[in-house]
Design a protein with these regions (language model features):
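Soluble non-cytosolic domains of exported or imported proteins
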Residues: 29-30, 93, 231-234
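Non-transmembrane alpha-helical segments in soluble domains
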Residues: 36, 40, 99, 103, ...
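Glycine-rich nucleotide phosphate-binding loop and flanking beta-alpha elements
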Residues: 46, 118, 147-148
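Conserved donor sugar-nucleotide recognition element shared by glycan-biosynthetic enzymes
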Residues: 67, 91, 95, 306-309
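Helical element adjacent to the flavin cofactor pocket in flavoenzyme catalytic cores
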Residues: 74-130, 135, 139
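C-terminal segments that line or cap access tunnels to active or ligand-binding sites in enzymes
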Residues: 137-139, 147-295, 302-307, 311
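Internal hydrophobic alpha-helix adjacent to the cofactor/substrate pocket in enzyme cavities
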Residues: 309-321
Length: 321
């Protein structure tokens, strides 16, 4: 995203050699537009019908509010082909197993269960209060949600102003058990519920394992949009039960209650909107990299998935360390 607001690009190529590339293209400024507007400008109406499925139903918001730069960062050529071709991979033991295995190989393993309550940056050092004890470091890389960073760190006015521009998606999940003989045999997109007017209803349900009739079915719901009121969480949970019934997959009941075996509401896909994207939000944050012994990474600096987040972290380390 860095430089896009000014029609400039500068970084490492997505090749094995990762050679440095830079240049100018005024058309890059269009990436700050909401994706709906970008498609209209380029006369690409059919793209929305294909891309709304892996974007909006996966919790990344509506095309009339999310800047194009985020959409194209996520749905690059390879990723789009994999979705269209049904080549979607999952990990047998879940994605957390990747990081557990990685952590086991690190010379300095991650310290878990760390409750950070205070960060003070002074005298070219970083003082962090973690689990009630103060520790001192040379540099700080923040990957936690930046909009909450001022709640425990000695943020400057510039940091507070920029981070206050961040919003996020309220993306909810419910794992439910379906009535016997009513189980779906595959996952399913509910296209009409990917439109803003149907906010708070099931956009997709996920059927993970083949030929396991009693597996939990996972429902996914968005509960907020730009400029709108945040919907009530419990009401959206009730909506999903009605939706599954209407889709022919009624939730099984036990002792008169629906069998919802797990549910959650998540801080998901932090982002800025088009007006701040176009005003150079990313360039302003980039200009702060290294100041006060602090660097900024995490989802907001790239995109809300593992691939892009890791890519930015790699790029940050190459540039500054």
């Amino acid at each position: 995203h860095i430089g896009v607001a000014n029609g400039h690009y500068d970084g490492f190529a997505c090749t094995p050699e990762r050679e440095h590339i830079s240049g100018d293209n005024p058309n890059l400024k269009d990436l700050s537009m909401p994706f709906d507007d970008f498609l209209k400008k380029n006369n690409l109406p059919l793209v929305k019908e294909v891309w709304v499925q892996p974007f909006t139903s996966f919790g990344y918001g509506y095309f009339d509010e999310i800047p194009t730069g985020y959409v194209l960062k996520y749905l690059d050529f390879t990723t789009t082909l994999q979705f269209v071709g049904g080549q979607i991979w999952t990990w047998k033991d879940g994605t957390q197993s990747i990081y557990e295995a990685l952590n086991n190989k690190l010379k300095h393993a991650a310290t878990l269960n760390s409750d950070i309550t205070k960060i003070v940056r002074k005298d070219n050092k970083v003082y962090i209060t973690v689990n009630g004890k103060e520790e001192v470091f040379d540099k700080l890389i923040v990957t936690a949600p930046l909009q909450y960073f001022p709640e425990y760190a000695d943020c400057s006015d510039e940091e507070k102003t920029l981070f206050s521009k961040i919003d996020y998606e309220r993306y909810d999940t419910e794992a439910c058990i379906i009535e016997k003989d009513k189980y779906p045999d595959q996952s399913y997109y509910v296209m009409e519920n990917m439109e803003p007017q149907n906010l708070g209803h099931v956009m997709i349900y996920y059927h993970r394992w083949f030929n396991e009739p009693d597996q939990p079915i996972i429902n996914y719901v968005l509960r907020h949009r730009k400029g709108g009121e945040e919907l009530n969480y419990d009401q959206c949970c009730a909506n999903t039960i009605d939706d599954m019934k209407n889709l022919g997959c009624p939730v099984r009941e036990e002792n008169g209650k629906p069998m919802i075996i797990n549910k959650g509401k998540w801080y998901y896909f932090p982002h800025v909107y088009s007006e701040d994207y176009a005003a150079g939000w990313y360039d302003k944050v980039e200009a702060m990299q290294g100041k006060n012994s602090t660097f900024y990474a995490g989802e907001i600096m790239s995109f809300g998935d593992m691939d892009e987040t890791v890519e930015f972290s790699h790029d940050l380390v190459e540039r500054y360390f």
